[in-house]
Curated annotation (Swiss-Prot):
Lineage summary: Bacteria, Pseudomonadati, Pseudomonadota, Alphaproteobacteria, Rickettsiales
Binding locations of Mg(2+) 1: 7, 139
List of catalytic residues: 7, 67, 139
Residues that bind Mg(2+) 2: 67
Bound cofactor: record note: Binds 2 Mg(2+) ion per subunit.
Transmembrane domains' residue ranges: none
Main location: cytoplasm
Source organism: Orientia tsutsugamushi (strain Ikeda) (Rickettsia tsutsugamushi)
Subunit structure and binding partners: Homodimer which binds Holliday junction (HJ) DNA. The HJ becomes 2-fold symmetrical on binding to RuvC with unstacked arms; it has a different conformation from HJ DNA in complex with RuvA. In the full resolvosome a probable DNA-RuvA(4)-RuvB(12)-RuvC(2) complex forms which resolves the HJ.
Alphabetic keyword roster: Cytoplasm, DNA damage, DNA recombination, DNA repair, DNA-binding, Endonuclease, Hydrolase, Magnesium, Metal-binding, Nuclease
Name of protein: Crossover junction endodeoxyribonuclease RuvC
């Protein structure tokens, strides 16, 4: 079973693909979708949608998992994050792929064992759990952690 994990952002959306075979988790690939700062919001959202669609057609995931939004003090950044998530979710919906979302503290707990873990701790555990030797960004590790959380969550029924 292939799971695509997504760490949404208007600037740098992290993505990570893992495969699950029984209790074995295998790292397949990961990366970051970067948008151009001078582009309009519509172009940025269109680029994110297009790249997510390319990932879906390339990896054919059984399930897509995404980090939930948390509203912070900066209202405008929260709104743009919600818009990026909407663009991503519309692509997932068009392909009718099984979908789940997880709060950041639930993801941290699944990976590190503590909901208040630091980003570098999540990154280290993702690399350790998935036997990743190369350098990965925090956006990639967050996306891979989200995919991993989906793999251990009861919402995914392995057939």
């Amino acid at each position: 079973m292939i799971i695509l994990g997504i760490d949404p952002s208007l600037v740098s959306t992290g993505w990570g693909v893992i495969s699950i075979s029984g209790s074995i988790v295998n790292y397949i690939d990961s990366g970051v979708i970067k948008t151009v700062s001078k582009d309009s919001l519509v172009l940025k959202l269109g680029n994110i949608s297009l790249m997510i669609e390319k990932l879906i057609t390339r990896f054919n995931p059984f399930h897509v998992a995404m980090e939930e939004v948390f509203i912070n003090k900066n209202y405008s950044s929260s709104v743009t994050l919600i818009q990026a998530r909407g663009a991503i979710m519309s692509v997932i919906g068009r392909y009718n792929i099984d979908f789940s979302e997880y709060a950041p503290n639930k993801i941290k707990k699944a990976i590190v064992g503590a909901g208040k873990a630091e980003k570098h701790q999540v990154q280290q555990m993702v690399k350790l759990l998935m036997h990743i030797k190369k350098a990965i960004s925090k956006d990639e590790s967050d996306a891979l952690a989200t995919a991993y959380t989906a793999s251990v969550n009861h919402q995914i029924k392995i057939i």
